[in-house]
UniProtKB/Swiss-Prot annotation:
Keyword Kinase: no
UniProt gene name: mutS
UniProt-recorded name of the protein: DNA mismatch repair protein MutS
UniProt-listed SMART domains: MUTSac, MUTSd
InterPro entries xrefs: DNA_mismatch_repair_MutS (IPR005748), DNA_mismatch_repair_MutS-lik_N (IPR007695), DNA_mismatch_repair_MutS/MSH (IPR017261), DNA_mismatch_repair_MutS_C (IPR000432), DNA_mismatch_repair_MutS_clamp (IPR007861), DNA_mismatch_repair_MutS_core (IPR007696), DNA_mismatch_repair_MutS_N (IPR016151), DNA_mismatch_repair_MutS_sf (IPR036187)
CDD domains listed in its UniProt record: ABC_MutS1
Protein family per UniProt: Belongs to the DNA mismatch repair MutS family.
Residues the entry annotates as binding ATP: G601, P602, N603, M604, S605, G606, K607, S608
GO cellular component: cytosol
Length: 840
């Protein structure tokens, strides 16, 4: 016979049935309890004590719990690990409940919807995607700031890249995923996948500026958030359309290899461009700076607008210093506005709002003193919101606690009735003191005192030795080992007045605070607009501080130009780490007629640094930053493509060579004549001749069909002869100094090809044994004196091009065109290559 389930456990099971994919925290008194499998798993993850309910029954129910006051800490840990948490609250006072206490889930917290994050700086983006007619829509929002955007994309690879750039932890899908897509999201990107296929009619977004698919994706994202948060989301901004092409396009591999916002070793900020440029003083400014680095501009007018303000701040040191001090007093307005909207704002949040608003007049005044045209628009957007600051300053006490139940929140003079209750409490305290003094005098008991606790209320404390002097109008309340507690009619009357005043005072203060919170909601839009303006000012002052500190110059950007001319250029991050004295600057020149720069030279000589230096300089210029150079004339690039380093994707089964070819293919397919391509040692992941042949073919293809500015570093010295065949290719190399058998890398880029590779010298620097190095040198001499193998191209032969196709080339081309390479697995791609090889 099955054991009977208690009403409480039945209530738990009924609620759990609606949230099978979440840990259910079930409020019971002062604890949140977990049961069954949730309890077992949570006990292990959170290191909780696993106990059981109905221990003496045949099948005790596993149980674990956390104190309600510490629940946020445990919830955050579960969410950080990628789990969902459903919180079921008591919906009525247990003392007043008839039968079982009513409970209901009030919020589902997920990796993409948490707003109480310990890291108050980084965004926490929740992404939704939808699909129709071979097109994808991607919408994202940050619940903690209210940001809400959407775009449409043509390829799944672009969707993946955008999600990776956003550093999302959860994705809401509006259509059934196939197995390959699930694998990408779950295994490779470690995303929590949630589903939202339906859109409630009242949540359907139909904005004219969005496509039908964009409206659909944004609606499904909004529906998911409403379903999980179960509250008003007044802080959410109207969904905004954006286009990838409106920014300098870089895929995630490029951003990663250039270490723009996260270093490759630890996936942290230190040693990145973000780390270097971040002299921001506000949380909003820090987030905005990261987004600027992630999405550089392609509009020259927008770039120049930023640079002009950076120049103004650079030219006015003292005003900038005052501005920085004012910015330091501004708290995270975006997150504070969100906490108000979510009903989670506590008294200290309002004090931070008031303090932030009190600094706005100072910021505005500094911009007025500067009186520069570029600052006019920003100055006009600085809304002091005097109504809100006045409301908070009149209502909230400067010494208010973090909680809304401890009292002392509302200022004296804000509410007449509250002041009366407080006066009664103060009078009661003086009445107690007077009564204590009177009874001491009447009874002659010098040690008599009036104390208070929750159980006995107010009482007279009398020690054992003085009990003979207790007056008749005292009555016993409690007996202790060495003393007794007594009451009196007068003390009871005073206590009743004080308790009533305390209860009514606490209740009224709570109501007044909740009213203030509700009234503040009407200012959320203005707070968010103010936050955006302050963030922009903060970013621009940050760029000016870095420019001054590092000795950067304002670059010249020319729309439509194809000339690159950088004098004394440096790698911004390497210089910051090493120090300017140690860094060797280099010129970078790609005149109108030069598209490709073929770079040769030994390992460790600085080829990769030189190429990264160029890419970072372009990115810095196009976010509106000054750049590390003596002079810099640049075109405006539409995209940057890189293949740098051996970033094997072993998790997905892709080798170095497959990754090389995939990234090269991405550049070849997407680059335009306005793009920048950087290839570092392309082809080294396969056999020498295969690699060399592919490298040459790719160079030829870029030269003949794309015309993008390209830096191509290689160890294949045979490729340097291409300058005789390709009009728009120049050779450069990293200079070395060879003296008495020792080689010094000068880290200086010089015209012409390198004449040696110095591989043995690099091995010597790495510390290989001397006998091994001597043997390698002997083998090298033999190889250099050995006749060239027949396989090698003879001097008199024409240099081969991989784009001279076989007779059946049209058939092969049609086969290639029929493949969707973005959705092919590594195995499928290799099988297809073998099939093509067999058909040649």
């Amino acid at each position: 016979m099955a054991e009977k389930i208690s009403p409480g456990m039945q209530q738990y099971l009924d609620i759990k049935q609606d949230y099978p994919d979440a840990f259910l925290l079930f409020r019971m008194g002062d604890f949140y309890e977990l049961f069954y499998e949730d309890a077992v798993n949570a006990a292990q993850i959170l290191e909780l004590t696993l106990t059981s309910r109905n221990k003496n029954s045949e099948n005790p129910i596993p149980m674990a719990g956390v104190p309600h006051h510490a629940a946020t800490e445990y919830i955050d840990k579960l969410v950080d690990l990628g789990y969902k948490v459903a919180v079921a609250e008591q919906m009525e006072d247990p003392k007043k409940a008839v039968g079982i206490v009513k409970r209901a889930v009030t919020q589902v917290i997920t990796p993409g919807t948490t707003i109480d994050t310990a890291n108050s700086v980084d965004n926490n983006f929740l992404v939704a995607i939808d699909f129709k007619a071979k097109r994808y829509a991607l919408s994202y929002m940050d619940l903690s700031t209210g940001e809400f955007k959407v775009t449409e994309l043509s390829e799944f690879s672009a969707v993946v890249g955008e999600i990776a750039s956003l550093k999302a932890r959860e994705i809401v899908v509006g259509f059934p995923l196939d197995e390959a897509q699930v694998k990408v999201f779950e295994r490779q990107m470690n995303l929590l996948i949630s589903e939202q296929f339906e859109i409630p009619e009242n949540l359907l977004i139909e904005l004219s500026g969005l496509t039908a698919l964009e409206n659909q994706a944004a609606s499904k994202l909004l529906a998911y958030v409403k379903e999980t948060q179960m509250r008003d989301l007044s802080h959410l901004q109207e969904v905004e359309h954006y286009e990838i092409k409106d920014f300098l396009q870089m895929d995630f591999a490029t951003k990663s290899s250039l270490e723009l916002t996260a270093n490759k070793r630890e996936n942290k900020k230190h040693g990145t461009l973000y780390w270097l440029l971040d002299e921001t003083k506000t949380a909003m400014g820090t987030r905005m700076l990261r987004s600027w680095i992630d999405r550089p501009l392609v509009s020259n007018s927008a770039i120049q607008k930023r640079m002009e303000i950076v120049q103004v701040f650079l030219d006015h040191f003292f005003e900038r210093s005052d501005l920085i001090e004012a910015l330091k007093g501004v708290y995270d307005l975006e997150r504070l506005a969100s906490r108000v909207s979510f009903g989670k704002a506590v008294p200290v949040d309002f004090l931070q709002l008031a303090n932030s608003l009190s600094n706005v007049p100072a910021i505005k005044n500094i911009l007025e003193v500067l009186d520069e045209m570029p600052l006019n628009e920003l100055r006009s957007q600085l809304d002091e919101i005097p109504e809100l600051s006045g409301l908070i300053n009149s209502a909230i006490s400067e010494n208010a606690s973090r909680t809304i139940t401890e009292g002392g929140i509302i200022k004296k003079g804000y509410n007449v009735q509250l002041d009366k209750y407080r006066e009664a409490l103060e009078n009661g305290t003086s009445w107690i003191a007077k009564l204590e003094a009177d009874e001491k005098a009447k009874t002659g008991i010098s040690t008599l005192r009036i104390d208070y606790n929750r159980k006995d209320g107010y009482y007279f404390h009398i020690t054992q030795s003085q009990l003979n002097s207790v007056p008749e109008h005292f009555y016993r309340k409690a007996t202790l080992k060495n003393s007794e507690r007594f009451g009196s009619q007068e003390l009871t009357e005073i206590e009743e007045i004080m308790l009533e005043a305390r209860e009514k005072s606490s209740s009224l203060e709570y109501d007044l605070f909740m009213g203030l919170r509700a009234e503040t909601e009407q200012y959320i839009g203005r707070l968010q607009a103010l936050a955006k303006t302050i963030a922009e000012i903060d970013c621009l002052q940050s760029l000016s501080v870095v420019a001054e500190k590092q000795g950067y110059i304002r670059p010249t950007l020319t729309e439509g130009s194809r000339i690159v001319e950088i004098k004394g250029g440096r790698h911004a991050v390497v210089e910051a780490v090493m120090g300017a004295q140690e860094y060797v600057p280099n010129d970078i020149e790609l005149p109108e007629q030069t598209d490709i720069q073929l770079i040769t030279g030994p390992n460790m000589s600085g080829k990769s640094t030189y190429m990264r230096q160029f890419a970072l300089t372009v990115i810095m210029a196009q976010i509106g930053s000054f750049v590390p150079a003596e002079t810099a004339n640049l075109p405006i690039f539409d995209a940057i493509f890189t293949r740098i380093g051996a970033s094997d994707n072993l998790i997905s089964g892709e080798s170095t060579f497959m990754v090389e070819m995939s990234e090269a293919n991405h550049a070849i397919q997407k680059a335009t004549s306005r793009s920048l391509i950087i290839f570092d040692e392309l082809g080294r992941g396969t056999a020498t001749y295969d690699g060399m042949a592919l490298a040459q073919a790719i160079i030829e293809y870029v030269h003949e069909h794309i015309g993008a500015k390209t830096l191509f570093a290689t160890h294949y010295h045979e490729l340097t002869d291409l300058d005789k065949e390709l009009d728009h290719l120049d050779n450069v190399h990293v200079a070395t100094l060879e003296q008495n058998g020792n080689v010094t890398f000068l880290h200086k880029i010089t015209d012409g090809p390198a004449d040696k590779s110095y591989g043995i010298h690099v091995a010597k620097i790495a510390g290989l044994p001397q006998t091994l190095l001597e043997r390698a040198d002997l083998i090298l001499q033999k190889l250099e004196n050995k006749p060239l193998p027949a396989k090698k191209v003879a001097d008199e032969q024409e240099q081969l091009s991989l784009f001279d196709f076989a007779e059946n080339s049209s058939e092969i081309i049609e086969k290639i065109k029929g493949q969707n390479v973005d959705n092919m697995t590594a195995r499928e791609a290799l099988n297809f290559l073998w099939e093509l090889k067999d058909s040649l």
